Design a protein with these regions (language model features):
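Extended catalytic-interface subdomain
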Residues: 153-154
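Conserved acidic residues
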Residues: 102, 123, 150
């Protein structure tokens, strides 16, 4: 077993690994971690379907990857995760191709935006980060289940420490909106979703939730100095790291290649067979109560009752039920 850490890069994770014959789908693939994930997987011989909502940005990212990896086998697909009709249209179109998906990487997301709603009226962060991926994943489940050793990777975050999910008020209809609390709810939802996938389909599917670390990407486009300060204070209040790390909020920045490494590791390694459903960070299995800026998590994210209830709530919100096994 190779030993990895916070500075491990995607290329180091895939050193000596052949992904020939494997098909990956990556959401949010038009920039940042998604684009780097696609580049790395392509360099190891994988076929990759890049999914994003902006056609110009998606085509530009695909062109950059083709220049970097001339032998790459890329497809693209347009999906707006803030629009359930867009998700349904894409899934219906994709399933007509009868093409198995070996690994789905739910990478797309929005962070700490001002209060706004999706096309269907859901609070934007919960609606995009969780509900959009919840619907897309379930609609694509026939293709995933027909894949070879299928996996579903959900991009979560240390941001889950800001808040657990709210089953009573997911859209902030009766409580005051806070950008970081909303982000925390959505990132906790990603983990509960992962856990419930495993409970329902773990005999066939491996699923992991991933903390990428802190990376400068388009995800931070809504961040103001005030929001950054609030984030640091929130992390410091929850950090179990050293006093020195707490002074900076325990927020070491990573390169793009290091930031995407954990999700690439989760999508490809054979070292996680005994850890199905785990929360991962720095290419390691998560540690309850550990430093959240590394691979630490709060215990509420492994609550089975919450995961079941969130699944039921999500079905109600997207107005569609899915098989339990």
């Amino acid at each position: 077993m190779k030993i990895y850490g916070a500075e491990t890069t995607t290329d180091e994770v895939l050193e000596g690994v052949s992904l020939q014959g494997r098909h990956f789908m990556v959401t949010g693939a038009s920039s940042g971690l998604g684009e780097e994930t696609v580049r790395a997987l392509s360099s190891a011989g994988a076929k990759v379907t890049m999914v994003a909502r902006n056609s110009d940005k998606l085509d530009a990212a695909a062109d950059r990857i083709r220049k970097s990896v001339p032998t790459t086998d890329l497809q693209t697909g347009l999906v707006d995760l803030a629009d359930l009709s867009s998700i349904r249209s894409y899934a219906e179109e994709y399933l007509q191709e009868d093409a198995p998906i070996d690994v789905l990487i739910n990478n797309a997301g929005v962070m700490a935006c001002p209060f706004m709603t999706t096309k269907d009226g859901f609070e934007m962060q919960f609606g995009t980060n969780h509900l959009g991926h919840f619907l897309l994943t379930n609609l694509l489940m026939p293709a995933i289940r027909s894949g070879q050793n299928p996996r579903i990777i959900n991009l979560s975050s240390a941001g889950h420490t800001h808040s657990d999910v709210s089953l009573d008020d997911p859209n902030f209809e009766t409580s005051e909106y806070n950008a970081w609390e909303s982000y925390g709810r959505s990132k906790s939802a990603n983990i509960h979703f992962t856990r419930e996938i495993v409970r329902r389909y773990g005999d066939v599917i491996r699923s992991f939730a991933v903390h990428p670390g802190v990376i400068l990407t388009e995800l931070g486009r809504h961040l103001t100095p005030e929001l950054m300060e609030e984030m640091v204070e929130r992390v410091k209040a929850r950090s179990t790291s050293s006093a020195e790390a707490k002074e900076t909020g325990g927020l070491p920045f990573k390169s793009m290649e290091a930031g995407a490494a954990t999700q690439v590791w989760a999508a490809t390694t054979d070292d996680l067979e005994e850890n199905n459903g785990a929360y991962l960070g720095d290419c390691k299995v998560g540690v309850e109560g550990g430093n959240p800026s590394e691979n630490g998590y709060l215990p509420y994210i492994y609550n089975e009752d919450t995961a079941k209830a969130l699944w039921s709530l999500s079905e109600q919100m997207v107005q569609q039920e899915f098989p339990s096994s």
